[in-house]
């Protein structure tokens, strides 16, 4: 009885801890406005959303040359290789071994003396051990682990989920790259428009300053008014210099995103840009959350983590491994 009790205690101690897998949280079926509209916002690709042909060309260049985006593409290849490896765990491991060796026995060694005593005249010539001794071998073996606890299947599921997560992460990187490029491009157009406005303001300020200076000569204005308009001219000139500096920074930022140096940033005019249509879809924008690549990537990572937990629990159980081997061995 004491032995049985100790065995039960040992079995209870080897039991893996129970993990709660239920993370469901009750959420309201609709928002505060009570919208039950099932209309889904159709996602638009970037080449449809952006009507500017120059911006489209920049996006194409960025997707080909941006270093960060190319790294994310390589991570997809790494995840795909890990998935292929996980699939291979469910298949038998087959090995083919072909070997050849040459051994020369020393005259005053145990092997040398033993072989000289073994090669007696009464032994057939083809059974004598030669010196040097050439050995040849050919063998075939296989080993297969039965997936009785689902450990290997869960590993494959985790690898597949991580591959999908890397795909979604790459889509997220693409979305961020395109949005950053579009923001820099449109801000650059805005700076061009600001430069045009400042130039017009500078011309107007210079005319006002000259007019005030002439009026002062006639005694109709004071030196204070002349100095005020001159200060206005200097202020606008400083803003123009600052604006030119910002334009240079934006151009360098776009070139950095494109991965091409140096690069002349051609852009559309502000008035031309205003005439371009903006394609929009009808529906509830909140529904697009289900299509966000960062959300889907996090969901895939959660699925992979759950599969890893189940595989780790199954690793505590005994494994069933089947194997066999056979081959030929001879010497000359």
Model features per residue range: what roles?
Residues 74, 78-81:
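Membrane-embedded segments
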Residues 55-57, 78, 135-137, 183, ...:
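Transmembrane beta-barrel architecture of outer-membrane proteins
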Residues 1-64, 112, 122-124, 244-290:
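Terminal intrinsically disordered/low-complexity segments used for targeting and assembly
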Residues 243, 293-294, 300:
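Metallo-beta-lactamase
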Residues 70, 93-113, 125-132, 137, ...:
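Small/polar (Gly/Ser/Thr/Ala-rich) solvent-exposed segments
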Residues 297-319:
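Long hydrophobic segments that form regular secondary structure
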Residues 15, 161, 168-284:
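Periplasmic alpha-helical coiled-coil/stalk elements that build and connect Gram-negative outer-membrane
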């Amino acid at each position: 009885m004491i032995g049985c009790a100790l065995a039960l205690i040992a079995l209870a101690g080897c039991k893996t801890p129970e993990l709660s897998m239920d993370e469901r949280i009750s959420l309201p079926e609709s928002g505060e406005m009570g919208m039950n509209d099932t209309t889904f916002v159709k996602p638009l690709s970037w080449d449809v959303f952006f009507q500017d042909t120059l911006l489209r060309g920049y996006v194409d260049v960025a997707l080909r040359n941006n270093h960060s985006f190319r790294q994310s593409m390589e991570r997809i290849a790494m995840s795909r290789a890990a998935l292929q490896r996980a699939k291979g765990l469910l298949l038998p491991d087959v090995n083919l071994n072909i070997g050849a060796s040459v051994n020369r026995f020393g005259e005053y060694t145990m092997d040398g003396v033993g072989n000289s005593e073994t090669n007696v005249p009464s032994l057939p010539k083809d059974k004598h051990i030669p010196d040097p001794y050439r050995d040849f071998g050919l063998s075939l073996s296989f080993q297969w682990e039965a997936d009785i606890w689902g450990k290997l299947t869960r590993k494959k599921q985790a690898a597949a989920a991580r591959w999908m997560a890397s795909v979604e992460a790459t889509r997220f990187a693409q979305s961020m790259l395109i949005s950053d490029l579009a923001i820099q491009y449109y801000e650059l157009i805005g700076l061009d428009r600001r430069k045009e406005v400042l130039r017009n303001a500078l011309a107007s300020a210079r005319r006002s300053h000259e007019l005030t200076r002439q009026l002062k000569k006639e005694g109709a204005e004071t030196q204070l008014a002349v100095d005020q308009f001159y200060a206005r001219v200097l202020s606008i000139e400083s803003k123009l210099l600052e604006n030119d500096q910002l334009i240079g920074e934006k151009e360098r930022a776009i070139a950095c995103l494109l991965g091409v140096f140096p690069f002349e940033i051609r852009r559309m005019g502000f008035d031309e840009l205003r005439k371009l249509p903006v394609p929009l879809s009808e529906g509830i924008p909140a529904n697009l959350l289900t299509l966000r690549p960062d959300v889907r990537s996090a969901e895939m990572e959660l699925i992979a983590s759950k599969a890893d937990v189940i595989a780790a629990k199954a690793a505590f159980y005994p494994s069933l491994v089947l194997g066999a081997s056979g081959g030929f061995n001879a010497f000359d």
